[in-house]
Amino acid sequence: MTKSAKTPAAVVLGEVDLPEGQLLILDPGLGRFWRHDAEPASPRKKDPAAHDLRIVGPDAEAAGRAYDREFDPRHLFDRTDPQDAVKHFGRFAKEQGFDARAEVLSSRVPHAERARLAVEHGKGLGVVKYNGLWAVVADGLPRDRGLQVIGVPMPRGEFAGRWRSIDVVVDGKAEAVRSEQVSGVMVDHGQLLFAGLGPMGRFRMWESLDGLADYVFFGKDAPALAKELGASDLGKGVFGWKDLPVAQVGEKATPLQERIGKDSLAVGVDYRPHCNLERLNAQLRESEEDAGSLVLDGARAVGCGNRWGDGIFPVSRHFDAKGRTVRLRVELGTEERQQLLRRIQLRQRAAIVTRAILDDGEPIRFAERMKPHSAQDSGWAFSSGVEDDTYMKKASNLVVVSLRSLLARCKELDAILDAPVGSVFRREGEGFVPE
């Protein structure tokens, strides 16, 4: 089939090897929280101790599903209030008529085991909790060959340059006739990593693999500061020191940070130990596709930017007519995600407000959305009703401000801001109604 000019071709981001036939999808920037087969404690020392609970009894699974706290209804993971959790579940089960109870486990369930439990419960696709975060795991995939990871672009237009989805292709020629979906993979650093479940046990974040690290800085005041401190120009506006022994990083970092703080310099810093995450990020910084690869325990893994930022993204599994898995898909540019981004972008734009509101403290009583004059203009104009025609004709009585600043003063506006051009509202009680 000939592709439409409005449908850019898919982009191959790399290949992932799955020696056990199990795929794990998570945000690599959260990789230090994945403890694999180790004690699943948080790496942050300030975090309280957590416990895992198992739901038992004749109605255990039905009660767990109704309680709806975990993808795997047989457990409650990462609870810092275990006895309270036992009591809360007990009350729920009693009220709902379930013969089930929660027990605190004497030892915690490692993340790799949780992943296996998740795919068991989800019959091949599941959500696994790790230190309160979510990853997605899939089972029953080919072990004897690499699988392509591809970026499927959005059509040209409003969201051009973003991915509609990122797919792991099992059979690129087969036709998918049905799908199932879980929600989802939690992203906090705008990235995704596709790795074999077993190989993920070798992923290291903030732990240098060779005992070395880079310490870099950037920003408006960085060039002058680099000359002062004898730092190298590393290109693309970045300065600093490469391949420092980890133990010696402080010798460079301390005077640099003291200097930045003393004079409030416009400089950002980044500590980059030679770990798996930094090896991936170094590739992403140079990649036109914002993608890179790692080798973990001899198996290839693929990392990439998701081009939509942070959030929880659904993952779907697609089957052919014979019930075989033909691809897995991280759903990125969904209609819901597009609407969310439009809302965020709109609230970063400007609006017109009268000085009666801005300076004199009058409340917003009237709102009208006109056709925007630029990409930075929301089209919204707000008045209090005390202004007459003469007042409104005087340009100095009108001020351009950000919608965000108005929302801080009048939270009720948020409910009407997505209304189309031509909408007019007036205040009534604690909210706004169409005029």
Model region roles, listed by residue range:
Residues 1-5, 224-435:
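Acidic, proline/glycine-rich low-complexity IDRs
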Residues 3-283:
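Extended, low-hydrophobicity segments enriched in charged/polar residues
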